[in-house]
Curated annotation (Swiss-Prot):
Gene expressing this chain: Atp9a
Organism: Mus musculus
Modified residues (N-acetylthreonine): T2
Topological relation to the membrane, as annotated: Multi-pass membrane protein
Organ and tissue specificity: Found in most tissues except spleen. Also detected in fetal tissues. Expressed in brain.
Subunit structure and binding partners: Heterotrimer with MON2 and DOP1B; this complex regulates SNX3-retromer mediated endosomal sorting of WLS. Interacts with RAB5A and RAB11A.
Record-level Gene Ontology MF annotations: ATP binding; ATP hydrolysis activity; ATPase-coupled intramembrane lipid transporter activity; magnesium ion binding; protease binding
Identification of the protein by name: Probable phospholipid-transporting ATPase IIA
Alphabetical GO biological process terms: negative regulation of exosomal secretion; neuron projection morphogenesis; phospholipid transport; regulation of endocytic recycling; regulation of retrograde transport, endosome to Golgi
Length: 1047
């Protein structure tokens, strides 16, 4: 048999706005004071505001009470076919165009609209209840009369709000005071940015020093804040106290903010409200939900357009055969109404209900627990993926970091030699604690050991100090929290940090003798092997950013007064910061090839004068309102020169369970896997080999670093001469290639069995997805677990988020959410395949059902001199596509050609779907021919066998039509489910029972005769038997691939 010609509709923009903001008209936007601009907010005096601000109301509804019905109807009738059916129904009010009872056209349309309206109403009610619950939460507001209770919706800009532990922050605020002794608080931000690690926040120093919270109302102070924007990771502002002499000004940054939607994890805080309502960071980052339109839906739209063309052609032919006699234009309209069943009005409803079933089945699958379907509109996409783009860290790997290597240049310590590191640390502190009497000079061996111990100690101390980790003490049932914190109880201590890498490093320093036991915003405590506590003052902290790829900290040792600047970061940036050495680059490469994540650690000693000079310039830069980030970075960079290289650290991130067999399954299914990661080249390559993304006997072409067009041209030519090899390329080289040779590069890359892109920025990940879609026209699936994967996930045809240690941001942004990468195999091979095949069968059967009755109408009109008279009227035409055939046809969503275990065992079955065979122009044409044959057979058979009255034609043909549909469903089903049997018997019973009430259309006495029974039996047999024979012969002599596995 020849292959089907897959449907290839034009790829439209994949996302369309499915959520019109009907509940918020444009004129309401001006009520909040126009365009957002910087503001001055006086503490505790909302009446002093210099502009109008929006109410602090959360509103996630699409519509309000008045716009609900018009909004829903508009969203439905903007689709051509729904509008077309509305015009048909309205035409029945014109006497010259009426073909029967009004309900014949209005009931089906009303049913479709009722399903949509009910679904939207349920969603709106749920939204309203959630919004009301959030807006009604009660908070404490500080006023001159004391503390008063206020609802979240009544909070205003300038209010002083008190938020307790485990309470949600109701508005965007500046952090003024905390009840915590350490003068800071922790936030849980997982609902804002998806990250599960707690964030440290610091109050304004000036207000934290006030004796009580009530004193906030006694001072004259204000906050100057930037205009509202979507950036949740940055903030610029200043705090000014005017009643002091001289006035005090402090710069404000992200560390002083409490964004709405976050939760206070420690203590009780007081903040001043800056932004409310739609100006909240969380609201501005929440775009209207958008739906992806699946390729399957586009293909079905193509088919319905073909059917509409057929409808017009058939109507014109009927009128033409009448020689356009009389009022022929009215006849055209009547025939358009008569053959309107050619376009099935129930197709969209059936497919949407099918998608709901597929989503329910996915959620209920016990073999992929925790899987969530967030977009129920595209389950069929899972069955046709050609390119899978995956993140590395946390997706292919566990994101559970284990410290593996400490490298000092001349010596390296692995897991098997950590006791030596511990010995060096112990010897340093035991020597310091002893004050031995004068003795003979040390031997050479002793000097060497002391030198090595000193180097190891400096490295471990730097690792123990340079981080953003905070130890948190919790009650363990024996010791309460306060006592545990006071005694630094090991069993009660938990480390909180913004990255698993940070926790792994601090846990390792604890294992070798240097334990982080305490930290607040201004100090840090380390416990030594001799139970001595080292107190260090934190002078400055420079947090890690994706742009800088490094972090630093300046501390003062309280016992010696020494000031030290510690820094750690990626080798690509640290190589230009540390003093010249001849081993850094080589050893970084060696450790990366072992699959380790490498950090370079360095330090620099500062004199008091050097630090004071730096601090003055740094404070001045932080007070700048314009270009603050650039000025601050410039000041910090003045310190980052000629730093002393201390060590390299290697942390391993192990592969997730069953990653290798899952990738092998995907490869055998014809899916090409690309790994896009921000990690370094050597680490990414090593992980690709370990995961068998690149097979053992496969060559790897490492695309060398290129910086201009000429170099890119030469390297592409070199790559072109390679065959069947995996490609490894860095983000910098990728950017150059896409700038000058986008088409050539993508053409070559698409031919590779696997591609690894390292040092890849989030925007580049999304760009690669977009280019694959444009250049190949194939469906893409993006898999990730972190916030840097969100853009890639949203850009892909099908986004899958993995719930991991980096939070839920990717999971919440994805169409599907899984808990482990290995679940992806079953999601695609079983659920994706079944969803696509079931929807293909369902859509073609619904079309077949409509074409059958339309063919019968065409034959009937032709026989009776092309009269525009309906064959079936009233309840018959409505019941045909509802209670008589709806349940058996819809039961096809439960059908499957092979068992789940077989689909997983033979992923090659998935390849057939990539060619679009289940739904193609060929299969569509076959079903059209089947419909024409069966419709003609039934109608001509009824005309030949009826005896005297017209109602006999109706009875014979309609009964034969119902039985034919039921038999066709039975012949199509490949794996019977008990619900399918119930659907068949229930539909037949409904038809037989309803015959008693159909005396207006059917002769009840005639259908009880033997003559009726044998005529219906013969017609049904002639319409179905040849198709069964053809199906049997095809399975016998040209069986499909799946039948070979089930026979």
């Amino acid at each position: 048999m020849t292959d089907s010609i897959p449907l290839q509709p034009v790829r439209h923009k994949k996302r369309v706005d499915s959520r019109p903001r009907a509940g918020c008209c444009e004129w309401l936007r001006c009520c909040g004071g126009g365009e957002p601009r910087p503001r001055t907010v006086w503490l505790g005096h909302p009446e002093k505001r210099d502009q109008r601000y929006p109410r602090n109301v959360i509103n996630n509804q699409k519509y309000n009470f008045f716009t609900f019905l018009p909004g829903v109807l508009f969203s439905q009738f903007r689709y051509f076919f729904n509008f077309y059916f509305l015009l048909l129904a309205c035409s029945q009010f014109v006497p010259e165009m009426r073909l029967g009872a009004l309900y014949t056209y209005w009931v089906p349309l009303g049913f479709v609209l009722a399903v949509t309206i009910i679904r939207e109403a349920v969603e709106e009610i749920r939204c309203y209840v959630r919004d009301k619950e959030m807006n009604s939460q009660v908070y404490s507001r500080l006023t001159s009369r004391g503390t008063v209770k206020v609802k979240s919706s009544n909070i205003q800009v300038g209010d002083l709000i008190l938020v307790e532990k485990n309470q949600r922050v109701p508005a965007d605020m500046i952090f003024l005071r905390t009840s915590e002794k350490n003068g800071s608080c922790f936030l849980r931000t997982d609902q804002l940015d998806g990250e599960t690690d707690w964030k440290l926040r610091l109050p304004v120093a000036c207000t934290q020093r006030l004796p009580t919270a009530a004193d906030l109302l006694q001072i004259r102070s204000y906050v100057y804040a930037e205009e509202p924007n979507i950036d949740i990771h940055n903030f610029l502002g200043t705090f000014t106290r005017e009643d002091s002499d001289p006035p005090i000004s402090e710069s404000l940054s992200i560390e002083n903010t409490l964004w709405a939607g976050t939760v206070i994890a420690s203590g009780t805080v007081v903040g001043v409200v800056l932004y409310t309502g739609r100006e909240l960071r969380s609201v501005m980052n929440t775009s209207d939900p958008r739906s992806k339109i699946g390729l399957f839906d586009l293909e079905v739209n193509c088919l319905t357009k073909i059917l509409f063309g057929a409808l017009v052609v058939v109507s014109l032919v009927m009128v033409a055969l009448q020689h356009f006699a009389g009022r022929w234009y009215l006849q055209i309209i009547r025939f358009l109404l008569l053959f309107s069943n050619i376009i099935p009005i129930s197709l969209r409803v059936n497919l949407d209900m099918g998608k709901i079933v597929y989503s329910w089945v996915i959620r209920r699958d016990s073999k992929i627990p925790g899987t969530v379907v967030r977009s129920s509109t595209i389950p069929e996409q899972l069955g046709r993926i050609s390119y899978l783009l995956t993140d590395k860290t946390g997706t292919l790997t566990q994101n559970e970091m284990v410290f593996k290597r400490l490298h000092l240049g001349t010596v390296a310590y692995g897991l098997d030699s950590m006791d030596e590191v511990q010995s060096h640390i112990f010897s340093i502190y035991t020597q310091q604690s002893q004050d031995p009497p004068a003795q003979k000079g040390p031997t050479v061996t002793t000097k060497v050991r002391r030198t090595m111990s000193s180097r190891v100690h400096e490295a471990v101390k730097a690792i123990a100090l340079c981080h953003n980790v905070t130890p948190v003490y919790e009650s363990n049932g024996v010791t309460d929290q306060a006592e545990a914190e006071k005694q630094f109880e090991d069993s009660c201590r938990v480390y909180q940090a913004s990255s698993p890498d940070e926790v792994a490093l601090v846990q390792w320093t604890e294992s070798v003798g240097l334990t982080l036991v305490g930290r607040d915003q201004s100090s840090m405590q380390l416990r030594t092997p001799g139970d001595q506590v080292l107190n260090l003052t934190i002078l400055q902290v420079f947090p890690f950013t994706y742009e800088s790829k490094r972090m630093g900290i300046i501390v003062r040792d309280e016992s010696t007064g020494e000031i030290t600047f510690y820094m750690k970061g990626a080798d690509v940036v640290m190589a230009g910061i540390v003093q010249y050495n001849d081993w850094l680059e080589e050893e970084c490469g060696n450790m990366a090839r072992e699959g380790l994540r490498v950090l370079v650690v360095a330090k620099k000693s500062l004199t008091e004068e050097q630090y004071q000079d730096f601090e003055a310039r740094y404070v001045q830069a932080k007070l700048s309102v314009h270009d603050r980030s650039l000025k601050v970075a410039t000041v910090i960079e003045s310190l980052e020169m000629e730093m002393e290289l201390l060590c390299l650290t290697g942390v391993e991130d192990q592969l997730q369970a069953d990653v290798r067999p899952t990738l092998e399954t995907l490869r055998n299914a014809g899916i090409k896997v690309w790994m896009l990661t921000g990690d370094k080249l050597e680490t990414a390559t090593c992980t690709a080999k370990n995961a068998h993304l690149v097979t053992r006997n496969q060559d790897i072409h490492v695309f060398r670093l290129v910086t201009n067009r000429g170099e890119a041209h030469l390297e592409l030519n070199a790559f072109r001469r390679k065959h069947d090899c995996a490609l490894v390329i860095s983000g910098d080289s990728l950017e150059v290639c896409l700038k000058y040779y986008e088409y050539e590069f993508m053409e070559l890359a698409c031919q590779c069995p696997a591609v690894v892109c390292c040092r890849c920025a989030p925007t580049q990940k999304a760009q690669i997805v977009r280019l694959l879609q444009e250049r190949t026209g194939k469906l893409t699936c993006a898999v990730g677990d972190g916030g840097n994967d969100v853009s890639m996930i949203q850009e892909s045809d099908c986004g899958v988020g993995v719930e991991g240690k980096e939070g839920k941001q990717a999971s919440l942004a994805a169409d599907f959410s899984i808990t482990q990468f290995k679940h992806l195999g079953r999601l695609l091979m079983v659920h994706g395949r079944n969803s696509y095949k079931r929807s293909a069968a369902l859509s073609q059967f619904v079309i077949h059902r409509s074409l059958c009755i339309s063919t019968m109408q065409a034959v009937f009109s032709s026989v009776f001199y092309f009269a525009s008279v309906p064959l079936y009227q009233g309840f018959l035409i409505i019941g045909y596509s509802t209670i008589y055939t709806m349940f058996p046809v819809f039961s096809l969503v439960l059908d499957k050609d092979v068992k789940s275990e077989v689909a997983m065992l033979y992923p090659e079955l998935y390849k057939d779907l990539l060619k679009g065979r289940p739904l193609s122009y060929k299969t569509f044409l076959i079903w059209v021919l089947i419909s024409i044959y069966q419709g003609s057979t039934i109608m001509y058979g009824a005309l030949l066998l009826f005896e005297s009255e017209f109602v006999h034609i109706v009875a014979i043909s309609f009964t034969s039509l119902i039985l034919t549909e039921l038999l066709m469903v039975a012949l199509t089903i490949q794996t019977w489910h008990w619900l399918m049997t119930v659907a068949e018997l229930l539909s037949l019973a409904c038809y037989i029972a309803s015959l008693v009430f159909l005396h207006e259309f059917i002769d009840v006495y005639f259908i009880a005769t033997l003559s009726f029974l044998w005529k219906v039996s013969v017609i049904t047999l002639v319409s179905c038997l040849p198709l069964y024979v053809l199906k049997y012969l095809r399975r016998r002599f040209s069986p499909p691939s799946y039948s070979k596995l089930t026979s």
